[in-house]
Structures are given as structure tokens and as C-alpha cells.
Amino acid sequence: SGEHAGCFGWCMFDYATHKDFGSGDRICYHGVMDGFRNPKLAAALYASQGEQPVLAAGSGMDIGDYPAGQVGTVYVFSNADSVELYKNGALVTTLRQSPWASLPHPPLAVDDTIGQLLETQEHFGRRKAAMLRDCLLAAGKYGLPGMPLRKKLKMLLCMLRYKMSFSDGVALYGKYVGNWGGEATVWRFDAKKDGKVVSSVTLKPSARLHLEAHASAETLQEGDTYDMVAVRVRILDENGNVAPYAQLPVHFCVQGCLHLVGAETTVAEGGMCGTYLRTAMQ
């Protein structure tokens, strides 16, 4: 209507609720953080509107997470001047433009994971690379049977003009779109500010997980009553990324003049959980 002064998102964190809401366990899970204030991916959109360096990829880039192995458009949340995308160490593209220009630092869309690779890796000319890239991306998006007629005709023209066989196209598709077999694909996002890399995210298949625990305070001080601290726990891979499918049990054990507030054993949800500790008033 043009009369809105602003808006805010609901809500900051997950919370316990009553019998009429929740997800079967009376927890509302629509926070941008979980109940222990571990940030979910959505929190990166809000954090990126500030000035402290932020970089988060909206996907783990795992083809097994998507129908037909097609990752599709991925959104990157950052407040950098630009974000560079690398595949196995080779520069794919540089992200700068966004359709949401009204935001101070809008999300950046990755809808082309081939970029300049056909030129730098296959040494194709610019026109040939652009034509092939368009055809390969269309095949990935629609599937060969579902490709629009104009894309099929473009593919045929490309084969005739550059004397390519169908098997040549299949090989390029497997290498640059399908990413099946062969060595594991390593994706890297580098956020640059004033020409310097300020944040970097590396995504690759991983089975080496570890726990990260962060306390909301380093010192507890009793006054008229006990003091309390929140302990946030995340399950991370070797590159510091949350393992979102790690629904693993986490056991807490306390020694000394502290009491555990909550269950001794909990289960990580989305690779995250937490607990609270309080002083014993001794």
C-alpha cells in the first residue's frame, strides 16, 4: 500500500510454546537462532546488514541434497564488496550484483557454477565458451528432455559450428554440471573488502567432525543468588561449517562448584545444541 514504515521478522529464536503450536514437542522452531542462541542460516541475512565481516553460503553444495543432483540457485549472504567463487582452486566468477538493491548488503545469487572455467580450463574461445555454458546450464536446469526448444536448437547449432559430438557434450556436462564421480569437488567463497579477503568459506565432503563449545561468559559471580552461563555447542567439519545432518547425542558432565541446568544428555538438532550451568552457592 506504500504506507508501511518498516517491518521485522518473527522471530529471533526458537521457544517453548503451548499445546496448540509447536512441532509435536511444543517447540516453535521458526527462530533465526535456536533456543540456545546458536545462529541458523537465516541469521546470516540479518548479520550481513551490519559492518562486521559476514560470509555464509546458503547451501552446502552437496548434489545429493537436490533432485537429480541439481543444486540450482544458491544465495550468499555477505557485507563485502564482492565475493569470489572458486571450484577446486580455479576462479569461477565474481559476485557483485543483486536484485535486492534496497538492502544495505543484499544477498548475492549464484546461478552459474561454470563461469569462466570453460575458458581457463578447456581453453575455449569466449564466444564458444559462452554458448556452451548457456547450453550446459540449461541442460542442468531443465534436464535434456525438458529443455526449451530454443535451447535445444542452440545446442544443435553449437555442435554443428564447433564440430562437437554428443559424447563431447556429455563429458563437459559431467565435469562442470553433474559433478558425479571423480575427485571430490571443493568449493570456496572468498569475501573481499577494499581488495582484501576478509572472510572465506570452504565447502567439501567431510567426515571429520568435532565439537565446538562457547560459553556466554568466562567468569561467574554470585551475589544474592546464583549466577548462570549458557553453553552453546555446535558440531563442525574440518572447515568450520556446521554439520546440519549431525543429529548426534551430546553428553554433559560437570565437575567442581557448578550445577548442570537441564538434561545430562541431549541430541543436536541441525548440528547444534546447548545447555546451562549455574553456580552451586557454596
Where is each model-derived feature located?
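Edge beta-strands of extracellular beta-sandwich domains
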Residues: T94, K196-L211
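Low-complexity "stalk/linker" and mucin-like segments enriched in Ser/Thr/Pro/Ala/Gly
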Residues: L103-D112, G256-T275
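Beta-strand-rich structural segments
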Residues: V74-S78, D227-P244, Q282
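Short, well-ordered beta-strand segments
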Residues: H30, A90-T94, Q247-C257, A263
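Short, aromatic- and glycine-rich surface loops/edge beta-strands on solvent-exposed regions
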Residues: E119-A130, G178-G195, V233, Q282
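Extended substrate-binding grooves/exosites of carbohydrate-active enzymes
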Residues: S1-A171, G195
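Low-complexity, acidic Ser/Thr/Pro/Gly-rich terminal tails and inter-domain linkers that flank the onset
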Residues: K204-D224
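Short, solvent-exposed loop/linker segments at the N-terminal edge
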Residues: I63-G69, T219-V229
